[in-house]
């Protein structure tokens, strides 16, 4: 495998060089998860899934997020997991630096960096955040990832569109104008007409309406909070930034669509 050639090929179709290097790292890890027999114990989430869904170079992501399913999050278990990836890959995969505990509001997980090298010594580095899939009522579905290391792609467990939408919405509601995840607003717009509304309604109930730490109990309450956020001058300005606006739709259309969509999910 020649990472240098793959970077050149990806930049030719619109990827920035850093994003191309990150995609290589992610795709090597995805392929190794399948090859190592861990596909039933890991579910992929976050930007890697959104990038896979959209197939858009502008939605490329730098980091990787995953949850273990029925697998320990101890450092020993993580080290064993990475050694398994390395043993079942044509590339070298190793942990770079210490494994760090993550504690962010309700989230508990681990962060590590993976150093991945090809046969020519070309190295790429990616950050991997690992958590535990604890909501057993939230089904994980197989998703086909198109990867640069195998034209056949790989099928792995991943968060559904509905779960991704519900989690991004919950984060925005909690943080309000303090949120810096402006790209999430465009992600939710993209997902809004691609979901099963009955499933989404149930997930909104699980993630938001039934959560005692959340204030919102109805679609109207969600819309009131979103309106407050979208009306903030600084938030609006950041939302228009081309760094975050990966869809060629105005931020005003995006926010209006989201408000109307939320009201329709009953």
Regions found by a protein language model. Give the residues of each.
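Structured mid-to-C-terminal alpha-helical surface segments
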Residues: 1-42, 52-60, 64-266
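Glycine-rich beta-strand-to-loop/alpha-helix junction loops that act as flexible
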Residues: 44-48
């Amino acid at each position: 495998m020649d990472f240098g050639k793959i970077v050149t090929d990806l930049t030719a179709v619109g990827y920035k060089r850093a994003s191309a290097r990150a995609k290589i790292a992610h795709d090597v890890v995805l392929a190794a998860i399948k090859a190592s027999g861990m596909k039933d114990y890991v579910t992929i989430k976050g930007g890697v899934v959104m990038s896979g869904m959209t197939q858009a170079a502008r939605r490329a992501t730098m980091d990787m997020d995953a949850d273990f399913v029925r697998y320990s999050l101890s450092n020993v278990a993580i080290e064993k997991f990475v050694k398994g990836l390395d043993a079942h890959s044509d590339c070298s995969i190793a942990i770079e630096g210490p494994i760090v505990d993550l504690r962010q509001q309700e989230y508990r997980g681990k962060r590590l960096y993976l150093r991945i090298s090809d046969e020519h010594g070309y190295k790429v580095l990616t950050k991997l955040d690992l958590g535990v899939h604890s909501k057993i009522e939230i089904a994980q579905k197989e998703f086909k990832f198109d990867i640069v290391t195998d034209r056949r792609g790989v099928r792995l467990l991943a968060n559904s569109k509905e779960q991704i939408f519900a989690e991004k919405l919950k984060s925005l509601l909690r943080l309000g104008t303090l949120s810096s995840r402006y790209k999430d607003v465009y992600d939710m717009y993209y997902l809004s007409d691609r979901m099963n509304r009955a499933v989404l309604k149930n997930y909104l109930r699980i993630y938001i309406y039934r959560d005692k730490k959340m204030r919102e109990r109805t679609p109207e309450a969600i819309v009131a909070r979103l309106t407050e956020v979208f009306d903030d001058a600084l938030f609006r300005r950041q939302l228009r930034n081309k760094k975050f606006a990966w869809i060629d739709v105005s931020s005003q259309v995006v926010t209006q669509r989201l408000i109307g969509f939320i009201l329709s999910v009953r």
